[in-house]
Each structure stands twice: as structure tokens, then as C-alpha cells.
Amino acid sequence: MAVDPFACPMMTMQRKPEVHDAFREAGPVVEVNAPAGGPAWVITDDALAREVLADPRFVKDPDLAPAAWRGVDDGLDIPVPELRPFTLIAVDGEAHRRLRRIHAPAFNPRRLAERTDRIAAIAGRLLTELADASGRSGKPAELIGGFAYHFPLLVICELLGVPVTDPAMAREAVSVLKALGLGGPQSGGGDGTDPAGGVPDTSALESLLLEAVHSARRNDTPTMTRVLYERAQAEFGSVSDDQLVYMITGLIFAGHDTTGSFLGFLLAEVLAGRLAADADEDAVSRFVEEALRYHPPVPYTLWRFAATEVTIGGVRLPRGAPVLVDIEGTNTDGRHHDAPHAFHPDRPSWRRLTFGDGPHYCIGEQLAQLESRTMIGVLRSRFPEARLAVPYDELRWCRKGAQTARLTELPVWLR
């Protein structure tokens, strides 16, 4: 293609990358050059994308990736071999179904709803601290680094029983996980070294994670980690501390990184006045749905690979072919949405792939939705006159490779 799907230009809020429209014009299955070299294929059609995401011939197994690819630097997640059965994003088939059975009870909507007050308290505390600091400095609060990522990180740690209680601890935990390559695609070296050089000190984080695991074994409190422990015991017969730590480490990153990216965009839309002051709960839910369609935090799915030679959309793919689904492109397809490139929270319905589809559908969707609605409620009740400190059109966002999209900053007057 003439356009690079993996380019990372700086964009404005009202400008979307042209590559997605170009993909649709090129066809339902488009061959591109992968970042690490060699061919890859992007699925651009909504129906075909859902077919691929549900097709057992397309798998997440990183062993099928081209030999030249280098782990997380190329958008892969390659777990420690003995721990692979405990990571949702790198196994398929019955191994994946077993992990879903272990994780699903922890994300039960009723169980999550019971924690709404605690989630609201975390949002309120963070926003109040930012407002107080803004009042002292006379400068607007910066909600990307100061809130959007810290909020979901502190929430998932609270739910798991990991005693990360303040933003400073959260930042340290994230830096260690990224340095170890446990932060998801394109997050770090993946070899136990910091991308800037050196070996990070993991002892403090390991202590916190083990504290959550040991508490779960004692059944001190009804945390997500306790649920994972009970279900893993039932499925595997026994589960080690290392295995539990690996599971909750994956949830910490999955539970905050993409959510943090999305919350930045959602906050921008709320603070730009797109949500009516008298919006009820249903209106807030519709607003969140439209933001999920319009601002997917990941423009493409994680890589999948053809487990065998397969023909899809009239295109024959060889065994091992790397495949992406164009989430943002399908979300803004004019065949499914009126005015697809406009933000309209009153749309009668949504068709989106923001959380994926098929067996690997995001297990944390309900938590992300709850965090989004709760955050809006806290912001509107505590700071009813909050507003952007810069014009909406001056906000900038960019992509980190093919896997995440995020605002660079979000200066706000919290009043």
C-alpha cells in the first residue's frame, strides 16, 4: 500500500488516520509490510473480521510468528514457556477455554458492581489531589499522566488485593513491568532489562504481588486473586505462587494500559461539553459506547497467525501468515454507521470491535465500562465546572506502533 499502517503521526482530535479509509478501498484483506519485515495481512471488513476472530485456524501462538520477529518489540507477547498455560493472550483452544473459566468469575458483572463505591472513591481521591495541586500552583491539572492511567491501575490493584495505594507506587510498578517486557506489546525489552539499559529492581513489586497471593491463599479478603486461586485449583489441581503472580501481573497490565488510553479520550469528549449536563445513566452509557466506537484505544488487534494454509476473503494465506484486524477501520465503516467519522453519542445502536470478538473477546469489558461510567459520575458531581484548559482542537494524540493510541496530554481546570 502507498500508506503505512504502522506510522505514528501526531494527530488532532478531529482528524483520523487516513490509512483506515485506504484499507477499505483496497479490499477486505490487504497485504502490508510488517514492522519487522516480511508480509502481513490486515482484515478491513467487519463481517470478515468477526469470522477471522472466531476461526480456530487463526491463533495467538507466538511460536508461529516469523523467526525474525523479536518479541514485544514487534507486538508479540512471548511468555515464559512454563507459564504459558497461565496467560490468556498467548494460548488457544481448550487451554484458552480453561483460562477463561478461571478468570470469568472474577469479572462477573454483579461482583464488579459491588465494588462501585470503592472505584468511585479512588477516582474522587485522585481528582481531588490533582485539583488541590492545581490550586496551589495556579496551573491546570494534567489528567493523562496524573489520572487516566493511575485510576484504572489503582482500581485493578485494589480488586486484586495488590497493595499499590498511591500514584507513586503505581508508577514504580509500571516501570518495572515494562522493563521486564510484561507491559504488553512494544512496552519494553522483554528480556529482563530496562530498555534504557540495566536490570530493574523487581523485589518491591514481587513482594506486593506475593502479598496478594498469600492473602488469597489464607482467604483474608474476597479479592479477584482469591477467585483466581480457587478456580485455578479446581482446574489444575494445584497452582504455584509463580503461576498466580503471572496471572495477576497480566491482569494488572491488561486492566490499566488500554483502559488508561481510552479514558483520556473519554475525558476529552466529556470536558469538551459533548455530554449534556442533565444526562441520565442511560445517556452516560450511550456516551461511553460512542466513545468506544470512535476512540478505540488500540487501532488493531494483537497479532494472530494462520495455523495452516487458509483462504479468507478470496486471499490465500500461507501457514504462519501474520494477521491483524483493523478495529478502528471497522468501527468507522460507513456501511454500518451514518456519519462514521463524527462523534454522535445519540446513535441508536453501535457495531464495534473495540473489545474484539470470538474466543478472545476482552474479558475485562465490564470493568472498563464500569470505570468509565463511574469516572464520569465522580467528575460531574465533584467538579461540575471542570473544563479543558486548551481548545479541544489543540489536543494532540499519537500512536505507539500499531497497538495503542493515546493523548499526549490533557490540561484541565478542575472546578
From Swiss-Prot:
Reaction equation(s) it catalyzes: 13-deoxydaunorubicin + NADPH + O2 + H(+) = 13-dihydrodaunorubicin + NADP(+) + H2O; 13-dihydrodaunorubicin + NADPH + O2 + H(+) = daunorubicin + NADP(+) + 2 H2O; 13-deoxycarminomycin + NADPH + O2 + H(+) = 13-dihydrocarminomycin + NADP(+) + H2O; 13-dihydrocarminomycin + NADPH + O2 + H(+) = carminomycin + NADP(+) + 2 H2O
Gene3D superfamilies, alphabetized: Cytochrome P450
Residue numbers binding heme: 362
InterPro entries (UniProt xref): Cyt_P450 (IPR001128), Cyt_P450_B (IPR002397), Cyt_P450_CS (IPR017972), Cyt_P450_sf (IPR036396)
Cofactor: heme
Pfam families per record: p450 (PF00067)
PANTHER family per record: CYTOCHROME P450 YJIB-RELATED (PTHR46696:SF1), P450, PUTATIVE (EUROFUNG)-RELATED (PTHR46696)
GO molecular function: heme binding; iron ion binding; oxidoreductase activity, acting on paired donors, with incorporation or reduction of molecular oxygen, NAD(P)H as one donor, and incorporation of one atom of oxygen
Subunit structure of this chain's protein: Monomer.
Protein name: Cytochrome P-450 monooxygenase DoxA
Any one GO CC term of the record: cytoplasm
Family membership: Belongs to the cytochrome P450 family.
Catalytic class of the enzyme: oxidoreductase
Localisation: Cytoplasm
Pathway(s) served: Antibiotic biosynthesis; daunorubicin biosynthesis; Antibiotic biosynthesis; carminomycin biosynthesis
Enzyme Commission designation: 1.14.13.181
